[in-house]
Amino acid sequence: MISLSDLRKFKTEGRKFSCLTCYDASMAKAMEFAEIDSILIGDSLGMVIQGHDSTLPVTVDDMAYHTAAVRRGNQHSFIMTDLPFMSYATLPDALNNAKKVMQAGAQMIKIEGGAWLSESIRVLTQNGIPVCVHLGLTPQSVHVFGGYKLQAKTREAADQLIADCQAVVDAGAAILLLECVPAQLGQEIAELFPQTPVIGIGAGKETDGQVLVAQDMLGLSFGKVARFVRNFMKEQAGETAIVDAFKAYHAAVQDQSFPAREHTFQVEL
């Protein structure tokens, strides 16, 4: 089973690692066969699985249920689980809800925010709960941002995001996840924190790992698709097409053919 130490080692060795969202045991097993390095049980299940138009209605019980299902199906990948909207607003809530998803099978919890999370990160880490912090476009704050848009488009905004990264790493964050930021900034942050793995989704090819929503990269999302998505499924054929698509994604992350320039945001900062 891949561990947090392994992800840190991958970064040190310059070996890019793959991450996909997953919500059920059968898909988790397919990812195990494909040797996907990490799985995120994301609160994106609110839209992908439950049919909501945002992640906001998802509950901690939902996250624990899907975490347990994924863990039963996959004994290979490192597993992270989102704490959903307003489930970590207070320290007691953060501890109790993190405990619930860790007991369900998560190896790490993920929360969205910035420097203001420092105390929660410190307390969670002191209690043996590894923390990934999601920065940039944070879907739980979609109404604050006014929709799903590129973040940190100016040098000032980029520097603020870097300051937030520094604050949460100083507080104990073990992984950073950057969403929908310029490729240049993704590279800059990955280089600024040599001991902290940085995962990107729409953050350029130079982050240490890449994550996509599995349904997006399998072409199962209908309507407008984000710029940073590549459909790996349409490149496959045959009875094991899904596993082959996962394998192709894993290989493309490792050899850095994904994300290509057309999947990134090029902004002069």
From Swiss-Prot:
Pathway involvement of the protein, from the record: Cofactor biosynthesis; (R)-pantothenate biosynthesis; (R)-pantoate from 3-methyl-2-oxobutanoate: step 1/2
Free-text remark on how the cofactor is bound: Binds 1 Mg(2+) ion per subunit.
Residue positions binding Mg(2+): 43, 82, 112
Biological process according to GO: pantothenate biosynthetic process
Cellular compartment(s): Cytoplasm
Binding-site positions, 3-methyl-2-oxobutanoate: 43-44, 82, 110
GO annotations of cellular component type: cytoplasm
Keywords from the UniProt entry: Cytoplasm, Magnesium, Metal-binding, Pantothenate biosynthesis, Transferase
One of the record's GO molecular function terms: magnesium ion binding
Matches recorded under Gene3D superfamilies: Phosphoenolpyruvate-binding domains
Subunit composition and interactions: Homodecamer; pentamer of dimers.
Function, as annotated: Catalyzes the reversible reaction in which hydroxymethyl group from 5,10-methylenetetrahydrofolate is transferred onto alpha-ketoisovalerate to form ketopantoate.
Similarity section: Belongs to the PanB family.
Protein name (database record): 3-methyl-2-oxobutanoate hydroxymethyltransferase
Organism: Acinetobacter baylyi (strain ATCC 33305 / BD413 / ADP1)
